[in-house]
Every structure is written in structure tokens, then in C-alpha cells.
Amino acid sequence: MKLIAGLGNPGKKYDQTKHNTGFMALDHYLSKNNLDLDKDKFEGLWTKQKVNGEDVIFLEPQTFMNDSGKSIAQVANFFKIAPEDILVIHDDMDMPIGKIRIRANGKSGGHNGIKSIMACLGTNNFNRLKIGIRHPQKESVVSWVLSPFNDEQQKLMDAAFEVSENIINDFIKGKNAQYLMNQYN
């Protein structure tokens, strides 16, 4: 069984903001595959589906970004999903807008959602699909991550969401992190 989690903040106020890139990428995948997050439990919206013969949980934690680990750990523990079978999709300010990078483990890179997941799972050995939103140029970090993409930026993000769909499918098919890194980084 696989767990694919998109990170973001719940509520209309945060819809389409840069910090909700994980939600947007997962929503793109779900929409393209006619799937819905139809359950509300484990402090998140989720669904369990069979994709390419594999049982997959798709999850959007509703705990706010900084506590994302609570929801992910609850799902992983309940369904007995190993950390290496988890893929977390999130924004990354250290990469240009729309750039994608896969990581198999490592540090949080200052991302509070990833810090929370590490603390709650007790390991950093889970997969990440990072999508760049770049550092702010003039505005504060908070203002930047909580603002929407402009039209030009959104085109880059839409292209990234298309690539992320392929990455998610390859992950579900059992392609390991090394393969994904070689293919997409």
C-alpha cells in the first residue's frame, strides 16, 4: 500500500496560494483520474483507491502545514504503511517556480510541514516530491507563500503538475526513489 500526501493549509483563505502547492498538485492528479477525497478522518481529507493494481491512500492533511505530520502518521500507522511507501508533495522556496525535485530522505530544508512529518514518523526516510515556488524578492516570506501565483507563474506550475502526475503514477507502479530521481531530477 502507498500513501501520497499533498501538503497545504485548509480553508478558502489559503486556496491557490503558493504554500498550497502540494494540495494543488494532488488535486490535479485526482481530477485527471476522476478521484475525490471522500473521507474526513485522521485529521485529513482522504480516499483509498486501487490504482494500477496497488492500494493507494491519497491524503490532504487538514491540520495546517506546521502540523501535517499528525495526519500523515495517523494514516501510516492505521494502514501500516512503511515510510518508504510514502510520497509527500510540497512547495520548496529554494527552487525556481515550477522546478521539480525528488528526494528519498534528508533534512527538512527549513520546511515546517516536513519537520512535523519527520517528528511524527520518527524518521526522515520518506519520499518527497518538491515543487519550486522560489524565494520572495521583496515581500516577506509569509506574504509570499500565502499569495497566489500570477498568470506567468501559474503556467509554470501547471506544467509542473503535469510532470507530478507522471511521478505519482511511477511511484504507485513501484518505481523506487533512485529511478524517480534519475528520471525526473
From Swiss-Prot:
It comes from the Bacteria. Its main location: cytoplasm. PROSITE patterns: PEPT_TRNA_HYDROL_1. The active site is at H19. The record marks D91 as: Stabilizes the basic form of H active site to accept a proton. Its EC number is 3.1.1.29. TRNA binds at Y14, F64, N66, N112. GO terms for molecular function: peptidyl-tRNA hydrolase activity; tRNA binding. Monomer. Belongs to the PTH family. Hydrolyzes ribosome-free peptidyl-tRNAs (with 1 or more amino acids incorporated), which drop off the ribosome during protein synthesis, or as a result of ribosome stalling. This is Peptidyl-tRNA hydrolase.
